[in-house]
């Protein structure tokens, strides 16, 4: 696959990531996430707009078109199926999984996806708890995207007192920080783990697990962790 297609798919998935996290997709956010210059991002966004993959709204918000969203969903589906394979079958260390899946997402065919779904026993979420979108497009399912109604972001929890929660999702942005995802794994902050959280006066979120050192997340990262209240 050529670099142009890779770049397009990376941009589409990044916009999809931002939407999942509840962050407004702007060119500045893409520049931060992909570590690219402002002019490079603007040029790529303009090309993608000409190609009918997105539109730039009046408030500079990037909106995926129907065509662009379908492509973004397909890329994310491949990414999260790859993550499942890398963890469940290959046994790759958690902190290496996201970066490796970022490579696989650009080269996996739909035929391989369908075979993976069977081999992996019809998964609906990634190892990090995130829903695998677009399964129905492959004739598989159920689609897990609607299973998030009870979930809240760590930043949405009330401050002032400890709150017991179950960790459900660590988004792509969290996984992209190797030091952080390693620390979360080592302290047991993984999907389905029960933890206690507190919000500090500075707005950071402190995760408390008995027998482990507390983990403090800055607001940006806490926003990217979804939990369910106990």
Swiss-Prot record:
Gene3D superfamilies: 2.30.30.90, Iron dependent repressor, metal binding and dimerisation domain, Winged helix-like DNA-binding domain superfamily/Winged helix DNA-binding domain. Transmembrane segments: none annotated. GO terms for molecular function: DNA binding; DNA-binding transcription factor activity; protein dimerization activity; transition metal ion binding. Residues 4-65 form the HTH dtxR-type domain. InterPro entries: DtxR/IdeR_SH3 (IPR040767), DtxR_MntR_Metal-Reg (IPR050536), Fe-transptr_FeoA-like (IPR007167), Fe_dep_repressor (IPR001367), Fe_dep_repressor_sf (IPR036421), FeoA_core_dom (IPR038157), HTH_DTXR (IPR022687), Iron_dep_repressor (IPR022689). It is found in: Cytoplasm. Keywords: Cytoplasm, DNA-binding, Iron, Repressor, Transcription, Transcription regulation. One of its GO terms (cellular component) is cytoplasm. It comes from the Bacteria. The keyword ATP-binding does not apply. GO terms for biological process: negative regulation of DNA-templated transcription. Metal-dependent DNA-binding protein that controls transcription of many genes involved in iron metabolism. Homodimer. Belongs to the DtxR/MntR family. This is Iron-dependent repressor IdeR. It comes from Mycobacterium leprae (strain TN). The gene is ideR.
């Amino acid at each position: 696959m050529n670099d142009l297609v890779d770049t397009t798919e990376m941009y589409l998935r990044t916009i999809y990531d931002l939407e999942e996290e509840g962050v407004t997709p702007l060119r500045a956010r893409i520049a931060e996430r992909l570590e690219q210059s402002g002019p490079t991002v603007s040029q790529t966004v303009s090309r993608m707009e000409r190609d009918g993959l997105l539109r730039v709204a009046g408030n500079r918000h990037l909106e995926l078109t129907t065509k662009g969203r379908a492509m973004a969903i397909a890329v994310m589906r491949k990414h999260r199926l790859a993550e499942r394979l890398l963890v469940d079958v290959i046994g790759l260390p958690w902190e290496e999984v996201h970066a490796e899946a970022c490579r696989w997402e650009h080269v996996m065919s739909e035929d391989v996806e369908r075979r993976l779904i069977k081999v992996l026993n019809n998964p609906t979420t990634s190892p990090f708890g995130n829903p695998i979108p677009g399964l129905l497009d492959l004739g598989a399912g159920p689609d897990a995207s609607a299973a998030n109604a009870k979930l809240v972001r760590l930043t949405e929890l009330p401050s002032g007192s400890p709150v017991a929660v179950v960790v459900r999702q660590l988004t792509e942005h969290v996984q992209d920080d190797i030091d952080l995802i390693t620390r979360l794994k080592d302290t047991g902050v993984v999907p389905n783990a029960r933890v206690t959280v507190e919000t500090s006066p500075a707005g950071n979120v402190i995760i408390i697990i008995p027998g482990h050192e507390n983990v403090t997340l800055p607001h940006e990262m806490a926003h990217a962790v979804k939990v369910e209240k106990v």
